């Protein structure tokens, strides 16, 4: 039976770091799949982009097509082994925020758990400014908070279409990373035990 745990958070929240560290400690065995990487691979195959950060600037129609292709690939993987899906609940595009999982996509993936990683907007802004490798939009702290609020709302919608449980984990600069990693480890261990 397919088994997916989705982990989301806006760029700069520390989602990938928390995921990497939690997977080193959990008893559960998950394959980490990055939704954006799969979309990027599909977009490169089609000749639409050459850099990952260009995907969010494609037309909404093309992005939705890429999302559905990615969902099908994730479903195939999750039928063989549990998947920890690293992704974004919403994506900021030039025209506004796009849902990371339109209804037809979330219904294909059908996750068991949705984990949201959050931090204070000032912490996220600082992390983004230190990460010069990525081509990220410049946002104010208010815009960052709005994006996190939209992620919560979107995640509730996803849970409605998949019956997934929702967990919010906070990742703060002052000892928050260790606590966040421990919380995710508990969720991953619990997720696998619930499925047994």
Curated annotation (Swiss-Prot):
Q: Which domain of life is it from?
A: Archaea
Q: What is its main location?
A: cytoplasm
Q: What cellular component GO annotations does this protein have?
A: cytoplasm
| Pfam families with a match to the protein in the record | AAA_17
EC number(s) given by UniProt: 2.7.4.3
Keyword Hydrolase among UniProt keywords: no
What GO terms are given for molecular function? adenylate kinase activity; ATP binding
Reactions accelerated catalytically: AMP + ATP = 2 ADP
What is this protein's record name? Answer: Adenylate kinase
């Amino acid at each position: 039976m397919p088994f997916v745990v989705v982990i989301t958070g806006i760029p700069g929240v520390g989602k990938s770091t928390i995921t990497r560290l939690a997977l080193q400690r959990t008893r559960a065995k998950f394959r980490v799949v990055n939704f954006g990487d799969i979309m990027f691979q599909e977009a490169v195959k089609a000749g639409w982009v050459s850099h990952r950060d260009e995907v969010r600037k494609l037309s909404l129609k093309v992005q939705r097509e890429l999302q559905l292709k990615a969902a099908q690939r994730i479903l195939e993987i999750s039928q063989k082994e549990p998947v920890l899906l690293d992704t974004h609940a919403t994506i900021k595009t030039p025209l506004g925020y796009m849902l990371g999982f339109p209804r037809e996509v979330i219904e294909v993936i059908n996750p068991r758990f949705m984990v949201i990683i959050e931090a204070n907007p000032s912490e996220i802004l600082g992390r983004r400014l230190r990460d010069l490798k990525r081509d990220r939009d410049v946002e104010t702290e208010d815009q960052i908070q709005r994006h996190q609020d939209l992620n919560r709302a979107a995640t509730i919608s996803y849970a409605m279409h998949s019956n997934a449980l929702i967990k919010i984990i906070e990742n703060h600069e002052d000892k928050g990373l260790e606590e966040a990693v421990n919380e995710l480890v508990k969720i991953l261990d619990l997720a696998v035990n619930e499925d047994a």
